[in-house]
Structure formats: structure tokens, C-alpha cells
Amino acid sequence: MPPKKGGDGIKPPPIIGRFGTSLKIGIVGLPNVGKSTFFNVLTNSQASAENFPFCTIDPNESRVPVPDERFDFLCQYHKPASKIPAFLNVVDIAGLVKGAHNGQGLGNAFLSHISACDGIFHLTRAFEDDDITHVEGSVDPIRDIEIIHEELQLKDEEMIGPILDKLEKVAVRGGDKKLKPEYDIMCKVKSWVIDQKKPVRFYHDWNDKEIEVLNKHLFLTSKPMVYLVNLSEKDYIRKKNKWLIKIKEWVDKYDPGALVIPFSGALELKLQELSAEERQKYLEANMTQSALPKIIKAGFAALQLEYFFTAGPDEVRAWTIRKGTKAPQAAGKIHTDFEKGFIMAEVMKYEDFKDEGSENAVKAAGKYRQQGRNYIVEDGDIIFFKFNTPQQPKKK
């Protein structure tokens, strides 16, 4: 079957943020809400987790493998010499405090660390513990969430003024017509962020030109958020906490579409200290499970990332791409020659491969597709690329 011609792909929505696939998600919250403990269990590292504010000053960064039953199945099937999963880059950022945008606490340094990330795990505390002090004096996750939102919002407002002043000087008073469109776009951003007090990401109709300007400045409120609610072990196991419904209602109202994921740092820490057999027995006895796989997958998806597989006896590998990536660019993740000489992508859906039992069976069932350069790669595709090898220049 020849590869499909143009028009076999749907134009994806524009994505706000840095281009590329080596994106980072930062753990953000007030001091002493459990950020470093969460980072430790997530990355299996031992970043300092002491009970005092600003314990983490330089952000700790780690790569976390993305759990995926599809990847595990392909490894079991092929028994490859090399196994390379997808990874999520996670950064533990020191606690923000009220007034951070004005330099309170270690404010501006922390905000710059957030700016260097592409998404946010917004971690809030919903457990009581007299041994762990709260910087605001009491446990109130709604108040804490609002403090973080306000600090990010105020920092963006602070950024917009100088950008507009510079553009006005050059584009309006200086008559530089090339910069006039950017000035007009920044006026729209100012209206949305400063006048209407709304985060950049809440406006869903930014056009391509506006996205280009937003990507130039990387405003803090443009970054996607996943809300993580740190519960006591008891509350997490019984699936009850007085704050959870209130947090979900707040997020649905003020950050619609964002995920809220409850977890227990204390439970995750305990599970990590048990052997695999003891861990399984404990989870079964308490009819619960770790929240970490769900959190990792949610962070990966929030960054608009996905992956396709190459699979065989030599290697099973997950190749990370941005959502909406076309086949030639996906091929280029493996090697630039694959993109330059792209002919076609031979694609199997993971579900078809698992159901049919082999590549030959997928072909026999008519489910093995040859796709052209307009094909938009889908998450979990198993792909074999065909390409022309670039010719070497002839020696004279």
C-alpha cells in the first residue's frame, strides 16, 4: 500500500511554551508542604527534606522513567538487549512565600527557577502535623494555592510593563512597523493579564502569531499546572479529606480542565522503604495503590509530550515527541538522516500488535499502515521508518 498523500493529518492546536522535548516540570508550593519528600520518592533520590523553610535553595533535578504497560509488554515480547523508556524531567524548587515577586524569602531566585521550567506540579498540603511547621501558621490549602497563583500572576504583571514600554518606544514613537504587530499583541496580553487579572493559559484562542510572542517571553502563568494534594497516610487510604472537595471546586472554577491528584508523601516514603513483596502485601491489605505512576503520566501529558515506539530484539525504545508531530520530524528524533531522506512510516497501533500477536499477523489483518509525510504520529504508535540515505559528495 503506497503512503497516503497530503491531507491525512489534522492541524494540531498551537502550544504555548518552549519547543523541543527536553522539557521540565517544576515542583512548586509553599515551604514545608512536602515538596522535597515528594521529589525524593518520585526520583528515589535523597534531596534534603528538613523541617524549615528554604531547605531547598538550588533546584534539584532528576529524570524519572514514565511507567507504561505498553513499553513493558513490548520488552516482554521482544526480550531486547536494550530497553529505553520515556523520561520526565522533574525539578524540585524551593518554597515560595507571600511577597516572593517583591523578593520576599528567596523570591526572585525561586521565580527564575520556575521560569526555567515548562510546567508546574503545584503541591499543596492538606494534612495536620504539629511536628511540621506551616509558614502561614495553619493548614489551609485553598489559601496556599491562592498565594502561589497570586505570586505568579504578579510576577507576570511586573514583566509586562517593561516589555510594553520598550515596544512602544520603538514601534509606536519610533515608527518601526515590523514591531507594531508585537506591540499590539502585548497590549492584548496586558488587557488579559493585568486588566482582567487572568493567567495567560486561561485564554484558549491565542492565534499562531500571538503564540510566537508568548513563547518569546515565557510568562509564568502560561505554564500548565497539575495540582498535587499531599494527604496523611490515613486520609489517602480511606479516600477522605475535608479539603479535597473544596480544592477540586476551586480548581474547576479558577483553573478549569486542570487535574487534581491526591497522594500521600508519608505513604510513598513508607512504600519505598519496604521490599517489593512487603510493599505488595501492604497495598493489598489496605486496598490502596501508589499515586506516583498517575502523577508522572499527568506531568508528561501536561507538557504536551507523547512518544512512539521502535521495537525489536536489539532494542525497545520510547521516543519522546511533542503532540502534533508529523512523521518526518518524528523520524528525525532517531537520526537527522531519517528526516532528510524520509520516504514513509510503516505504522502499527500498539493495540493491534497486542491483539494480533505479531507483526505478520497485523499485516495479514490489514492493520499495518504506510503513512506519508503529513501523518501526525499518535501516542503509542509502533513505527518503522523507510528513508533514502543522503548521498555523499563525490570526490574530484
UniProtKB/Swiss-Prot annotation:
Mg(2+) binds at S36, T56. A motif (Nuclear export signal) lies at residues 267-274. GO terms for cellular component: centrosome; cytosol; nucleolus. One of its GO terms (molecular function) is ATP hydrolysis activity. One of its GO terms (biological process) is ATP metabolic process. InterPro entries: ATPase_YchF/OLA1, Beta-grasp_dom_sf, G_OBG, GTP-bd, P-loop_NTPase, TGS, TGS-like, TGS-like_dom_sf. Keywords: Acetylation, ATP-binding, Cytoplasm, Hydrolase, Magnesium, Metal-binding, Nucleotide-binding, Nucleus. Hydrolyzes ATP, and can also hydrolyze GTP with lower efficiency. Has lower affinity for GTP. Belongs to the TRAFAC class OBG-HflX-like GTPase superfamily. OBG GTPase family. YchF/OLA1 subfamily. PANTHER family: OBG GTPASE FAMILY, OBG-LIKE ATPASE 1. This is Obg-like ATPase 1. It comes from Mus musculus. The gene is Ola1.
